[in-house]
Amino acid sequence: MRRLGLSLHHDTSPSFAALACNQRPPPNGTVHACSKSRPPQLEPGKVGKKPIKKTMRIARIPTSIPPHLRLPLDLSAVSPMGSASEHDVREHLLDVDGVGEEGAAAAAGPKIRVRGLTRRSEARGEEILRGVDLDVPRGVVVGVIGPSGSGKSTLLRALNRLWEPAPGAVLLDGVDICGIDVLALRRKVGMLFQLPAMFDGTVADNVRYGPQLQGKKLTDAEVQSLLSLADLDPALCSKPASELSVGQAQRVALARTLANDPEVLLLDEPTSALDPISTQNIEEAIVRLKKTRGLTTVMVSHSVKQIQRIADLVCLLVAGEVVEVLPPSELSEAKHPMARRFLELS
């Protein structure tokens, strides 16, 4: 499929469709086909960046798409279903949700199950992830901490196929995500980055964009409700996105992600560029979404204190391996020396 290049304040040019749901494609701008290998037999196992400038980066993207560009766009990085028929959508949802005994069994298990996930750096040839095993329970916030370069962001990208989870397997509701249509998957698994791009236009234009790709227009009341969920004043609807502060832009991006009604939220250091008040606003929004929507959230952070405030489980990733998974209250009892080091420095 053709891609529409966009000029951002980055060295790469992410696809137009990826930006529609706050997702950035891999550095080479492509999404590789999933491995055909099957996931390993699941057995009970362990449940288991450098500082950035505090400046806002806004992509001036027109909110109206010429008709001749609407369908050919590579929508593989967009959460909405795009132009899929109602029949296709229903089939995808049935495939993901499961039915009968299998569906009930999936509902009883973890929301996300990772087994044997390994990834090697193409540039350096070294392993970024080394056989990661991790279970993410339903309706909880899992905080992922670890030193820079330990594979935290790579793990997040594998959970919705921005990086292909191969070798290894990632299961969503018991289903291998490589067997799920990528558009259906990213509609269910939303992702928010440190500095999301804003579309040119108003705040409401940004929030409406994902559903608009599905042919649905959110009402003013729906947009305002989403802004409230993201801890924003609904009166911001008509404000130009170019005039938003960094903290406001981050929360508008959160509302834009929520407009796709995801079941899982992936957050890659969403508060690293924010002031303390904006950070608190984002944290409160995450907790509220867990309580009101039952969202399963996986959040990468360098702040142990932040994870202790909002997470139900902490996953410590060191050199590409999960070395500890435990409740925040038990971090002081962690056996791995890196966990103790993190606590000493927090």
UniProtKB/Swiss-Prot annotation:
Single annotated GO MF: phosphate transmembrane transporter activity
Assigned protein family: Belongs to the ABC transporter superfamily. ABCI family.
Binding site for ATP: 146-153
This protein's GO CC annotations: vesicle membrane
Name listed for the protein in its UniProt record: Protein STAR1
Region described as Disordered: spans on this chain: 23-48
Keywords on record: ATP-binding, Membrane, Nucleotide-binding, Transport
Main localisation: membrane
GO BP term, example: UDP-glucose transmembrane transport
Induction: By Al in roots. Positively regulated by ART1.
Residues in ABC transporter domain copies: 112-344
Location in or out of the cell: Membrane
Record has Nucleotide-binding as a keyword: yes
Effect of loss of the gene: No visible phenotype under normal growth condition, but strong inhibition of root elongation when grown in the presence of Al or on acidic soil.
Function as written in the Swiss-Prot or TrEMBL entry: Associates with STAR2 to form a functional transmembrane ABC transporter required for detoxification of aluminum (Al) in roots. Can specifically transport UDP-glucose.
Taxonomic path: Eukaryota, Viridiplantae, Streptophyta, Embryophyta, Tracheophyta
Tissue: Expressed in roots.
Quaternary structure and interacting proteins, as annotated: Interacts with STAR2.
